[in-house]
Amino acid sequence: MPAGTTAAWVVFDRQAGGGGRIVATRNAHRAFRSASVVKILLAVDYLESRTTVPPADARLLKIMLRSSDDDAASTLWDRAGKGAVITRMARRLGLSDTAPPPASKPGFWGYTSLSAYDVVRVYRYLLDRAAPRVRDTILGHLRAATPCGTDGFDQYFGIPRALPRPWAVKQGWSGFGEVPPVRCRPGSASPGVVSTGSAPAGAVPAGSAPAGAVSTGTGATGARRASISAVALRARGSGVPDLGRPVLHTTGLAGKDDRYVLAVLTAHPAGGTWSASVRRITTLTAELYRDLR
C-alpha cells in the first residue's frame, strides 16, 4: 500500500478444511468507519424484527441494498432507533469490533465503526444462520447490485471490477466529496475487469457526511482534482475512525456456491482522489483473489 493508505482485509474460504477457515488476513480487527456497508445491518435488523414486509418497505430495502440509496437507509435508521440498531446487531451477531456512531452524531449511520473481521462475520451469519427469508432477501439484492448508485455514483470498484461473476456485493465510500466528477451510466461499468484507466465516480453517503464538499485543484481535463467532505475536515479527534481521511470498502461473496467471503476496507490520504483510491482497492482485491487460485 502507498504511504498514507491503510488497508485491512479478511478472506474466508467456506470450502477450506472441515467447516471453512480464514485464508488471507491483515489488520482484521482494525476499526474503520462503515460508510454504506452498515446498510447490511440495517436490513438484517429490519427483517428479523417482523414477519411481513409492506410493499413500501420492500422498495426501501431493494433500493438501499442494490443501489446504496442513502434516503432509504436514513428512513430505516431513524425508525430503528438510530444507534440502537448497531448495539442490537453487535450483540445478536457477536460483533466485537462494531460500535454505533458517537452520541454526539446520532443521525450519522455512516459513522458506525466496524472491522473486516466483523463484516465477514455478518456475511457468514447470513449464509449459515439467518432465516431463509432474511438470507434470500438480502443476498438476492446484493447479487443484483447496480453499477450506479441512485445519486449517480459508480459503485463497481473492488470486487465487481476485479472478480468474475458470480458475486454479491455491498460497497462503502465516504470523504470524497458530494458531486461525482463523472456521472455514472449503467453501461459504463465493466464488472470482472481490473481497470486502472479513467476513473468512475465517487460519493459521500448522505448518512456519513451530509455537509458540503471542499474541493481543491481544477476540473480541467488532466488536472489533479481532489475533494474531501467539510464535515470530515472539521471532525478530527471526534472518536470516529479515520475522520479527515476518505474511506473506500468492497465487501461480499464470490465464487461458485459463495465459496469466498471477502471484506477489504481502506482509508486513504486526506485529500486523496477517488480515481487513485479506486485503483488501489481494485488492484488489491484482484491480487487477493489471484493468490487464492
Q: For each predicted feature, which ranges?
A:
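A mature extracytoplasmic/lumenal domain signature
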Residues: 13-15, 36-38, 48, 68, ...
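Acidic helix-start/capping segments at beta-turn-to-alpha-helix junctions
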Residues: 12-15, 57-72, 78-82
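Penicillin-recognizing serine hydrolase domain
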Residues: 1-8, 14, 21, 78-293
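Active-site SXXK
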Residues: 31-53, 64, 262
